[in-house]
């Protein structure tokens, strides 16, 4: 029974030692925060071996009972292997502890001391468990999982340090594997380390760097990050001027032509923030017709369309550039009828900007509109839509009176906005029906409109 008990204690000590080795391995692997875990195709028979190799020096001789020993501070290559057959020092101490009758605690302590010596030797030389020898390279461009721009998956250009690459093993002789080497994981590109965070508030030199990156790259991932960074900085007035002075508006606006809807959306968002500045509007006006055309033909209710409508709304807050969009009035009203709730609200804000400019009244009321537009005056719509459509009607009605267009009704067709709002009488009936609306704000707005009729 004595030898059986002794063998059981040795086995328990080996299990504890293996666990401690794994902990040392995990801690050493986590020391380098800038390195990623490299995915490798390992054979199932080699999972117990992990080699440790320092930058310079000679290998230590892990003799019986001595464990891993340093032969010099700068010229040592300690080799640590986690298999029992490759750890004679660990075995020796475990057996010596069992012969002395120290029990399970003594054996575990002996194992821990040996591992501690090996770990301290490794830490002193800055070695890394499971490192890969040779240079790291990036595979050529192919799509990879994990995101739009793709992470980078390094490939190996050298042999694995440790048990398999050391040439000689300390245990049984191992036959060479006949298995063909695994192919490297193809990636689209290396991950680009953008120099700034997207929410950083940048100075003029930093903005110049971002603009240079945006101008030179064709990578959609980098373009998106750069546009978001510029758009966030354009929310601040001092950076609105800086981006314009650095020639940033043409650099950003050239991406309107890209086919990628995400890039176009980010481009419109950046230009939208820049358009708050009156001087920037003078630069953006060159592209306003192009933005309008793209907004009308892109997918209905898409994020690109909403971003384009927001930009057009900002550009028409003043009267300076409204005439550049007068050719699109029929498209605006068609979109008002076809769009979803959010598109309807945004397009009504855009049209209201035109109704506040009396000089645009004639072109506005003479355009053709769908007769179904009258359905927007139904009480089933929510407050925001009703308030906007009532404001639109109020402004047009006031402008018709102020511009004296009521006497020129013959020049407007039956499909025009003038006929729908002024001559048909259907619109007035719909508005009167809203006088009993449950929402007090809507009811007050209806009464205000009716008093002006």
UniProtKB/Swiss-Prot annotation:
Q: How does it sit in the membrane?
A: Single-pass membrane protein
ARM repeat boundaries on the chain:
195-235, 237-276, 358-398, 415-453
Question: Per UniProt, which keywords does this protein have?
Answer: Membrane, Mitochondrion, Mitochondrion outer membrane, Repeat, Signal-anchor, Transmembrane, Transmembrane helix
User: What is the name of the protein in this document?
Assistant: Armadillo repeat-containing X-linked protein 1
Question: Chief location of this protein?
Answer: mitochondrion
Role noted for this protein: Regulates mitochondrial transport during axon regeneration. Increases the proportion of motile mitochondria by recruiting stationary mitochondria into the motile pool. Enhances mitochondria movement and neurite growth in both adult axons and embryonic neurons. Promotes neuronal survival and axon regeneration after nerve injury. May link mitochondria to the Trak1-kinesin motor complex via its interaction with MIRO1.
Family label: Belongs to the eutherian X-chromosome-specific Armcx family.
Which superkingdom heads the taxonomic lineage of this protein's source? Eukaryota
Describe the protein's quaternary organization and the partners it interacts with: Interacts with MIRO1.
> Which segments sit on the Cytoplasmic face?
30-453
Q: Where is the composition biased (Basic residues)?
A: 167-177
Q: Where is this region: Disordered?
A: 58-77, 132-182
Q: Which residues lie on this side of the membrane: Mitochondrial intermembrane?
A: 1-6
Q: Where in the cell is it found?
A: Mitochondrion; Mitochondrion outer membrane
Could you state one GO biological process linked to this protein? hematopoietic stem cell homeostasis
Q: Which GO terms describe its cellular component?
A: mitochondrial outer membrane; mitochondrion
Q: Name one Pfam family in it.
A: Arm_2
**Region (Mitochondrion outer membrane (MOM)-targeting sequence), start-end ranges:** 1-6, 26-36
